Amino acid sequence: MEKIAAELLLKGLAPEGFADSQPIGLVTTDSREVCPGCIFVAFPGERFDGHDFAAKALEEGAAYVVLNHPVEGVPAEQAVISPDSYHAMMVMGANYRGQFHPKVVGVTGSVGKTTTKQMTYAAIAGFGNTIKTEGNQNNELGLPRTMFRIGRDTEYAVVEMGMSHAGEIERLAKCARPDVGIITCIGVSHIGNLGSQENICKAKLEICAGLAEGSPLVLNGDDPFLRKAALPTHVRPVWFSLGDENADVCALDVRQEGDGMAFTLCDKNAGRYEVTIPAMGRHNVANALAAYAAATRLGLAPEGVIAGLADFEQTGMRQKVVHAGSMDVIEDCYNANPDSMKAALAMFKEYPCKRRFALLGDMLELGGMSAPAHEELGRQAAEAGLTALVTYGPEAARTAKAAKDAGLADVVHAEDYQQAADALLARMEPGDALLVKASRGMALEKALALFYPVCAK
């Protein structure tokens, strides 16, 4: 974080007429990070209440503390009262963002946000100093933290925007003020909170609230909800598609090559290019198209963007291929929903190996759609060319039953991680491949921790 005047950073939070030019070089929510000249933001929590550390933060040199309410022992002149700590972070993040002028790409969507963010970063990073959202810092606390990482030498920023309720993307977009927006697709994640995919689409389109007049909005032309959505008139839609040559950017001759994909990219503005990406599945080709469209609409050269995409690296447990002895394991257990499950099974069906096995767990936060979604997953698994399916989790029991009913002969529903690992170890042989996918809360890496040591023997 670059140092900026307190009066600039606290504008909209401090009382009218507040004036203090002292430089602030850190905004923190962690009392252990407090240093002279910082601002400490107190968050109430289940285990700790940041308000309990406010007085100590001032003793250690904090210039100001942001509090939800007055705290005994904290001088009023050093306390900034904001009933909502998240709102305070967003206001300061927006104020800080306004002092600098990098080109910003904002990424949202139901599926593929993080991968598209990573691809966009890879596409842009070769053109100048670029930052991106780290980890899962895509909410009203994490996004301001990303803003605070912008410096005077930052030329580009790629910012992921997540949500679970309506209104959240609008607030994030107004903080980040992207120059280009991306909506990857409209799925069913958080449908329990929003009620319908139409409402999810409206929530994702809130990214337009942060886009200036004439800004490009990169949209999935293969998504029926985005296609029929009423787009704000102030944005300029840029459509990408797998196969539709009428789109602004499309992919033709899509094929899997080893652990990646190859395709012909057609750009109405720039012609045709042969592209390879080190990620499997047609859904990742769509993510690459979105990243390409955003980067080139910033004015970056297509050749350099494509070269960057070829160096893309997956993060975490997102379709990470692990060679376990003489078997391949595709770790895709960072998150899951019906759309990403379907895409993963389609990718895995084309994966070159002797036999295919899958360990699938619950998809969380589906509300009333959970039962039919898990049953449909079972039917999809039965058609995915699997030798055997192992499931784990209460909802995944529906998947196991549906797969059996659809004709998959070898199906095991495991009651714990050890049973899941044992079922796979008893069946798999050299040359086989395993797909592992579930929502993050199912922690399927614990089953893999029991599986891998035996494979290595």
Language model: regions and residue ranges:
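Active-site beta-alpha connecting loops in nucleotide-dependent enzymes
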Residues: 45-48, 315, 333-407, 457
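Acidic, Mg2+-coordinating active-site environments of NTP-dependent enzymes
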Residues: 8, 67, 71-75, 182-328, ...
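N-terminal leader/targeting and accessory segments in enzymes
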Residues: 1-91, 351-353, 379-380, 384-394
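Residue-level signal for inorganic ion chemistry
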Residues: 38, 57, 92, 107, ...
